[in-house]
From Swiss-Prot:
Species: Anaeromyxobacter dehalogenans (strain 2CP-C)
Protein name as it appears in the record: Serine hydroxymethyltransferase
Subunit composition and interactions: Homodimer.
Record's catalysed reaction(s): (6R)-5,10-methylene-5,6,7,8-tetrahydrofolate + glycine + H2O = (6S)-5,6,7,8-tetrahydrofolate + L-serine
Cofactor(s) demanded: pyridoxal 5'-phosphate
HAMAP family for the chain: SHMT (MF_00051)
Length: 417
């Protein structure tokens, strides 16, 4: 017999922890650049009965019966994704960005082939060739990095390495890079050496959808993304590609990498894509960028050094070496003050990955709450105060109180706390 109790009755321990996490999100400043807050509609889809349905295969071609409804759900997600990004084909089944990237690699290359990608140490991602990741284990990775003069991507180096190594894939994208990615220039290099260009736009997908960052879709064989971050959907992945690659890519996801898709997550993706197709989403993305620029200037006014001097998108990297702080110390101190960031490697970082010399800061979540430039100036000052006295418990307590007061003016998930 099916249990009929609500969560609070059936499992009070988990219910309590969920309330505590919701309260943490509501009462603190969420500045992790890869995090965001989904809408109640997205949450509702995630918790729907679609979680019960197995649906191996694709709409109209399933290995299970009873898929007539989830076929419609998934097709809506596909159609909305294609409309949002102007793509020929979309696969909305990847459970995460890592699976999307794996499928892209497997569709275009064989193990042992050469991949030219941005080094994790300079802002890339684990799946762009880190030796501890499948990408670094299966492929020959040639990393590119930044110019020391301005801490932006060294396109001359990218071109030189491409000509020297003739990669099968040129992987473009980053997880900690605050400047515009010039996909047209990358495409010229890829075309010159006969490489297939793959773009991981996970961090900037929302900006791309709103036309605030150049789109990689016209220039790339394959584009991968997560569906959270700036896109403000559920945690998951997606692949966009030219029609010529559609069949191969689909087969790499299923049956190649995954089994049954998570149709409740796909429904939530469809809801988020629908939200992103509305005019107000563009205004939201404009606010993200404006907030990031104001926050960056505020942090510099507080005496902090930013990698590359600022930001063009939703995030910035703070170099803490002039403060004689590590990212680990800064993350912990800010956390005690109710400000959540993540420690992050900076270019040419002398510290280990679990220590780091920097922190990564982003504005998507605070922008979702409705905060604007005025609040960003205040947030920058609060961060500055904490980093000036990271071991002073009185300072941290005072800042935490101010953070809680600020958040109270921008309530979130009030019915769930």
């Amino acid at each position: 017999m099916m249990p009929t109790q609500r969560l609070a009755e059936a499992d009070p321990q988990i219910a309590k922890l969920i309330r505590e996490e919701t309260r943490r999100q509501a009462e603190g400043l969420e500045l992790i650049a890869s995090e965001n807050f989904v809408s109640p509609a997205v949450l509702e889809a995630l918790g729907s009965t679609l979680t019960n349905k197995y649906a191996e295969g694709y709409p109209g071609k399933r290995y299970y019966g009873g898929c007539e409804v989830v076929d419609q759900v998934e097709q809506l997600a596909i159609d909305r994704a294609k409309q949002l990004f102007g793509a020929d084909h979309a696969n909305v089944q990847p459970h995460a960005g890592s699976q999307a990237n794996m499928a892209a690699y497997f569709a275009l290359a064989k193990p042992g082939d050469t991949v030219l990608a941005m080094s994790l140490n300079f802002g890339g991602h684990l799946t762009h060739g880190s030796p501890v990741n499948f990408s670094g284990k299966l492929f020959k990775i040639v990393p590119y990095g930044l110019r020391q003069s301005d801490e932006t991507i060294d396109m001359d180096e990218v071109a030189r390495l491409a000509r020297e190594h003739r990669p099968r894939i040129l992987m473009v994208g980053a997880s900690a890079y605050s400047r515009t990615l010039h996909f047209d220039r990358f495409a010229e290099i890829a075309n010159e050496v006969g490489a297939a260009m793959v773009v991981d736009m996970a961090h900037i997908a929302g900006l791309v959808a709103a036309g605030l960052h150049p789109s990689p879709v016209p220039h790339s064989e394959i584009v991968t993304t997560t569906t959270h971050k700036t896109l403000r959907g559920p945690r998951g992945g997606m692949i966009l590609c030219r029609e010529a690659h559609a069949k191969t890519l689909n087969s790499q996801i299923f049956p190649g990498i995954q089994g049954g898709p998570l149709e409740h997550v796909i429904a939530a993706k469809a809801v988020a894509f629908g939200e992103a197709l509305r005019p107000e989403f563009k205004e939201y993305q404009r606010r993200i960028v404006e907030n990031a620029q104001v926050l960056a200037e505020g942090l510099k006014s507080a005496g902090l050094r930013l990698v590359s001097g600022g930001t063009d998108n939703h995030l910035m990297l703070v170099d803490l070496r002039p403060k004689k702080l590590t990212g680990k110390v800064a993350e912990e101190a800010l956390g005690k003050a109710g400000i959540t960031v993540n420690k992050n490697m900076i270019p040419w970082d002398p510290e280990k990955p679990m220590t780091t010399s920097g922190i990564r800061v982003g504005t998507p979540a605070l922008s979702t709450r409705g905060m604007g430039p005025r609040e960003m100036t205040l947030v920058a000052a609060l961060i500055g105060r904490v980093l000036d006295a990271p071991a002073d418990e009185q300072v941290l307590a005072r800042v935490r109180g101010e953070v809680k007061d600020l958040c109270a003016h921008f309530p979130m998930y009030a019915d769930r706390v």
